[in-house]
Design a protein with these regions (language model features):
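Structural recognition of the beta-strand scaffold that forms the well-ordered cores
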Residues: 100-103, 124-128, 191, 237
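Conserved catalytic core of two-metal-ion nucleotidyltransferases
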Residues: 82-86, 90, 94, 142-210, ...
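The substrate-binding groove and active-site-proximal loops of carbohydrate-active enzymes
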Residues: 70-81, 117-124, 235
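Short, solvent-exposed turn/loop segments enriched in Gly/Ser/Thr/Pro and often Arg
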Residues: 103-111
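Catalytic metal-binding acidic patch
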Residues: 114-135, 233
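Helical scaffold of the NTase/Pol beta-like nucleotidyltransferase catalytic core
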Residues: 21-103
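Short, surface-exposed, low-complexity cationic segments
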Residues: 243-255
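Fungal secretory targeting signals
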Residues: 1-25
């Protein structure tokens, strides 16, 4: 008999709690405070009301998961880590047949040169509502190992689903991120938000209205059909009306201004060069070092 990951984790939680009650200890630990809180109640039905903030950021930087790091990477180390972070995520979603696309600042970076901004330290993607349900049912809290060219031992990435994703309202302001893809070697992560039908706007006759819990609203025609492209030398999907979406979020100047955050965009090399250091960015278009999955995937979306 097959048992879903969510139900198995709930069972393990109960088992650990029961065993702990049988063994008296002078140093009792509150189980929920142990943040290998990888064992949580994923009963499959979801909680009855929104909980407290689920995803926690580190005390030293809000784009790091403090369970896996105690300090940020250097400016030199960050770009290659982010590059493999998005490649492994996109590779995994493609292997699963799961619909995903880049959004927000990551989409803007794609617009310029299909590379992560050299000053950036986060990545934003979106997924469809059927995809978040599938990932929660079959792949929540799963680890995915990849061989990384030039790196002994490779890296392991964690897919973690926020159980509060079942609450589809923007009122759940503490849980606007629905899932994360986390680099367990550095603590860097990808924020994953699910795009859902906007029930309130649809009641008012806007039949194609979509929304995310983070407050962003869209029309179906803004996103679908998705376009094929490349990002960090890897196949990626982008929203259909990407120019419209970027202008609405960042203004039209974001698509033309070649000076930003102490960097200048070199029209010849298509690279953001550091202005203060008066030297070209190390982010050259070089040989592609793509990751290779070593963890098998049992279930896929049809």
């Amino acid at each position: 008999m097959w048992i879903s990951t969510s139900r198995l984790l709930a069972y393990l939680y109960g088992l650990v709690f029961a065993v702990g009650g049988l063994a008296a200890s002078d140093a009792d630990t509150d189980f929920t405070s142990v943040r290998s809180q990888f064992v949580k109640n994923y009963s499959g039905t979801g909680p009855s009301e929104p909980g407290e903030k689920y995803f926690q950021e580190s005390s030293f930087h809000y784009h790091y998961d403090g369970r896996f790091a105690n300090e940020p990477l250097s400016d030199k180390e960050t770009p290659p880590h982010l590059s493999q972070l998005i490649r492994t995520y996109l590779s995994t979603m493609a292997d699963l047949g799961a619909e995903t696309w880049i959004m927000h600042g990551t989409l803007l970076a794609w617009w310029w040169n299909q590379k992560i901004f050299p000053w950036d330290n986060d990545i934003d993607v979106q997924i469809s509502e059927p995809t978040i349900h599938f990932l929660d049912e079959y792949y929540n809290m799963t680890e995915h190992h990849f061989d990384i060219p030039g790196l002994n031992g490779g890296r392991t990435y964690l897919l973690e689903i926020n159980p509060n994703y079942v609450f589809r309202s923007m009122d759940d302001k503490m849980n606007v991120i629905d899932a994360r893809w986390i680099d367990t070697s550095s603590g860097l992560f990808i924020d994953i938000t699910a795009v859902r039908p906007d029930d309130e706007r649809r009641k008012d006759g806007d039949t194609g209205a979509l929304m995310c819990k983070d407050g962003h609203t869209f029309d179906e025609n803004d996103i679908f059909p998705l376009r094929n492209s490349h990002f960090e030398d890897f196949p990626v999907k982008v929203p259909f009306e990407y120019v419209k979406l970027l202008e609405e979020e960042y203004g039209s100047q974001s698509l033309t201004a070649t000076e930003f955050d102490d960097h200048h965009f070199n029209e010849e090399t298509l690279v953001w060069d550091s202005a203060s250091k008066r030297k070209r960015s190390s982010r050259r278009r070089s040989a592609v070092d793509l990751p290779v999955r070593t963890t098998p995937l049992k279930y896929k979306l049809e």
